[in-house]
Amino acid sequence: MGLKSDKWIREQSIENQMIEPFCEENIGKGVVSYGLSSYGYDIRVGCEFKIFTNIGGTVVDPKNFDEKNVVDFIGDICIVPPNSFALARTVEYFKMPHDVLAICLGKSTYARCGIIVNVTPFEPGFNGHITIEISNTTPLPAKIYANEGIAQVLFLQGDEPCETSYADKKGKYQDQEGITLPRILK
């Protein structure tokens, strides 16, 4: 399994729309950087957020998620409360090749401020926006800047295409648009 370079990422994005919209250069002046890098792609966070709250007084249950646990917010700057959590989505839409797995890591700009980003791997054959999990581990409110970088995606190409892709197994988050809350198939 090999890590893919900027040349490969550019080719896949231009010829096969692997990343849309695709930014061919790394933009970093005056913003949290985003776009193509040497061996990855810095994704942007969109302007839609779901911020966790305890107003509803419910328990967070991934098998039976209560939407009262979150407050919707749309804007250029999202304030994540101290020791709290928010969901967001990428600006970019991904169409993953059937022999490629992507891993996403948080950006050091945010990590150095106590903001931790988690994203599960993008499986081969996955199509959709990526839901981003953002944790504010500090005792202070934290700013997240919409339409700027939030994490870096690394692309790993397997030795051969997988037997069953995410699309083949009709993954529960396939073709997701916007922020997708937890789902359990029944």
From Swiss-Prot:
Its EC number is 3.5.4.13. Pfam families: DCD. The keyword Phosphoprotein does not apply. Keywords: Hydrolase, Nucleotide metabolism, Nucleotide-binding. The keyword Hydrolase applies. DCTP binds at K107, S108, T109, Y110, A111, R112, Q152, Y166, Q176. The active site is at E133 (proton donor/acceptor). Pathway: Pyrimidine metabolism; dUMP biosynthesis; dUMP from dCTP (dUTP route): step 1/2. Transmembrane segments: none annotated. It catalyses: dCTP + H2O + H(+) = dUTP + NH4(+). GO terms for molecular function: dCTP deaminase activity; nucleotide binding. Coiled coil: none annotated. GO terms for biological process: dUMP biosynthetic process; dUTP biosynthetic process; nucleobase-containing small molecule interconversion. It comes from the Bacteria. Homotrimer. HAMAP family: dCTP_deaminase (MF_00146). Belongs to the dCTP deaminase family. Catalyzes the deamination of dCTP to dUTP. This is dCTP deaminase. It comes from Campylobacter fetus subsp. fetus (strain 82-40).
